[in-house]
Curated annotation (Swiss-Prot):
This is U-limacoditoxin(14)-Dv74. The keyword Ribonucleoprotein does not apply. The modification Arginine amide is found at residue 36. Probable toxin. Does not show insecticidal, antimicrobial and antiparasitic activities. Does not induce increase in intracellular calcium in mouse DRG neurons, suggesting that it does not induce pain. Residues 1-20 form the signal peptide. GO terms for molecular function: toxin activity. Its main location: secreted. GO terms for cellular component: extracellular region. Belongs to the limacoditoxin-13 family. Expressed by the venom secretory cell of the spine. The spine is a cuticular structure containing a single large nucleated venom-secreting cell at its base. It is an independent unit capable of producing, storing and injecting venom. On the back of D.vulnerans caterpillars, spines are grouped together by 50 to 100 to form scoli, of which there are eight in D.vulnerans. It comes from the Eukaryota. Keywords: Amidation, Secreted, Signal, Toxin. It comes from Doratifera vulnerans (Mottled cup moth). It is found in: Secreted.
């Protein structure tokens, strides 16, 4: 259960960083970044 929570937190962190980078410069169409938009 703890591993799942850590993985979810890491996933959310990466998606937030990706969306921030997307707003700042450009969206790299890789992995979950493309799904997120």
């Amino acid at each position: 259960m703890l591993k799942f929570i850590l993985a979810l937190a890491l996933f959310l962190h990466l998606t937030m960083e990706a969306s921030a980078a997307c707003k700042g410069k450009k969206c790299p169409p890789t992995g979950f970044v493309g799904m997120r938009g």
